[in-house]
């Protein structure tokens, strides 16, 4: 498993402390990217899910080109709001914008650019448990709905023969902010469980029936780490950074699969063949077919205005995206993200031609 570079060190400290403040509101977020170039650099805001890889990319890109990118890791909902209001140059989200959100954007049409793929993992704090816990989508829905409340419930022990599970309460931990990670997790539950689809349903924010809240992936990781009996959902990189275990989830083929670069890549095996440069890239790979596919996988997106009013910033944004597809992707696996398939990256490079520079 990777260990993040020095610029990301404070994130682990915050998670260990159970801190629930947003990265975008702390000095750590700007450690590698707060400076600006002669004409202001680029500003962005949004998802915490890809913050580790974006932090690395922005630092590497600044070192190569001198273009500084200031990114606030405030959650997908916040990134969509700031882009829609025109206060940042780009947004970032783990949930694609819906039609209503797109229609409300002040700067006109918005394009979705997938950057990497990742996994949302189900992490837990069960002292003494060595092997990965095995869970089905039905059991997950029952736990997060408050219908299964004890770790030694028969619905859980029957999936984990030979494993001694405690008779203690299950404490659910969920996000409190508008979150793409929540969208990925609840979309998966809604896709696999009719009762969950009926309510709470899927979204960046839902009315959780039970549980405690944490802000950002950091906050949820911190809550789970310091609370025996807790269960929550976070991005894979945050689980590895905080040495948190994660469950093997039953996929659409019936196999129990742990999250990994290989199992996330397997979830996207056939995507590239269905897309072109002009496709609508608001797509889902949740509960994908294939015996090796991890079912709670997702793309994450950068969101950019199709018509860039500032030609200098517009070109910088296009150049950065091109760099991410041609070079930046090489660092993804070292930070527990799955790079996009080569064929898909080439189609996204062609898609950059849809961005108009300097037009209102």
Q: Where are each of the predicted segments found?
A:
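Flexible loop/hinge segments at secondary-structure junctions
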Residues: 19-360
């Amino acid at each position: 498993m990777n260990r993040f570079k020095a610029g990301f060190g404070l994130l682990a400290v915050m998670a260990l402390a159970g801190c629930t403040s947003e990265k975008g509101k702390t000095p750590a977020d700007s450690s590698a990217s707060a400076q600006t170039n002669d004409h202001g650099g680029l500003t962005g805001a949004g998802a915490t899910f890809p913050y580790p890889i974006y932090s690395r990319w922005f630092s590497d890109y600044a070192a190569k080109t001198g273009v500084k990118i200031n990114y606030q890791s405030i959650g997908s909902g916040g990134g969509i709001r700031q882009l829609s209001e025109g206060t940042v140059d780009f947004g970032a989200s783990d949930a694609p914008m819906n039609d209503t959100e797109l229609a409300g954007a002040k700067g006109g049409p918005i394009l979705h650019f997938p950057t990497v793929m990742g996994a949302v993992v189900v992490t837990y704090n069960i002292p003494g448990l060595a092997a990965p816990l095995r869970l089905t989508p039905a059991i997950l829905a029952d736990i997060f709905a408050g219908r299964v409340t004890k770790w030694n419930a028969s619905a859980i022990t029957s999936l984990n023969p030979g494993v001694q599970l405690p008779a203690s309460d299950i404490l659910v931990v969920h996000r409190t902010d508008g979150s793409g990670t929540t969208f990925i997790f609840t979309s998966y539950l809604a896709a696999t469980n009719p009762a969950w689809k009926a309510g709470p349903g899927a979204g960046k924010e839902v009315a959780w029936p039970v549980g405690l809240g944490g802000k950002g992936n950091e906050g949820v990781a911190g809550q789970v780490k310091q609370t025996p009996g807790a269960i929550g959902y976070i991005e894979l990189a945050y689980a590895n950074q905080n040495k948190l275990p994660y469950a093997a989830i039953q996929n659409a083929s019936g196999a129990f699969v742990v999250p990994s670069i290989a199992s996330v890549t397997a979830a996207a095996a056939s995507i590239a063949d269905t897309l072109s440069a002009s496709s609508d890239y608001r797509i889902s790979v949740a509960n994908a077919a294939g015996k090796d596919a991890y079912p709670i996988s997702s793309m994450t997106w950068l969101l950019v205005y199709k018509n860039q009013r500032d030609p200098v910033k517009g070109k910088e944004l296009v150049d950065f995206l091109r760099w991410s597809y041609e070079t930046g992707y090489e660092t993804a696996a070292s930070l527990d993200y799955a790079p996009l398939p080569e064929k898909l990256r080439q189609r996204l490079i062609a898609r950059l031609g849809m961005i108009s520079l300097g037009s209102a």
